[in-house]
Amino acid sequence: MKVKLITVGKLKEKYLKDGIAEYCKRLKRFTKFELEELPDEKIPNNASQAQNTYILEKEGQRILNKISNREFVIVLAIEGKQFSSEKFSQLLSATMLKGYSDLTFVIGGSLGLSQEVKKRASILMSFGLLTLPHQLMRLVFVEQIYRAFMIQEGSPYHK
């Protein structure tokens, strides 16, 4: 199975880059893991709702251009379904058993995601009502993907 994480915006902080790189390295033993950073749009100070919508649509089109019809897509959105680590691991297993060979996760930029991206999702997933910087969410989410594979393996990593 090929697993891809599409994100909006360039990661700036070294400690986040290092953490993500470590989990990407660990994931190689389970899957072909690909991280794709797409450019974000500049948000003007005091942007209007129309400007924000335009930015979301532009970023959304970039995301959709990276997703094929055959991919199972899980989009992180606050209104999505919450999963425990165990249930998330089961979801990944079930996706593989259904014959999907390409699994794509999407994390939006600071404004979130366009409705078109959410409509393309096979599943909307949420980490709860907490607000986290989208760059930090990348590290947390890559760790959870790694944890899901470790749970499938029966590893003591997940206690």
From Swiss-Prot:
Catalytic activity: pseudouridine(1915) in 23S rRNA + S-adenosyl-L-methionine = N(3)-methylpseudouridine(1915) in 23S rRNA + S-adenosyl-L-homocysteine + H(+)
Binding site for S-adenosyl-L-methionine: L76, G108, F127, G128, L129, L130, T131, L132
Subcellular locations according to the entry: Cytoplasm
Top enzyme category: transferase
A Pfam family reported for this protein in Swiss-Prot or TrEMBL: SPOUT_MTase
InterPro entries: Alpha/beta_knot_MTases, RlmH-like, tRNA_m1G_MTases_N
GO CC annotations, alphabetized: cytoplasm
Record carries keyword Ribosomal protein: no
Entry-linked SUPFAM superfamilies: alpha/beta knot
Gene3D superfamilies recorded: 3.40.1280.10
One MF annotation (Gene Ontology) recorded for this entry: rRNA (pseudouridine-N3-)-methyltransferase activity
Subunit structure: Homodimer.
Chain's role: Specifically methylates the pseudouridine at position 1915 (m3Psi1915) in 23S rRNA.
HAMAP family: 23SrRNA_methyltr_H
Name of protein: Ribosomal RNA large subunit methyltransferase H
Upper lineage: Bacteria, Bacillati, Bacillota, Bacilli, Lactobacillales
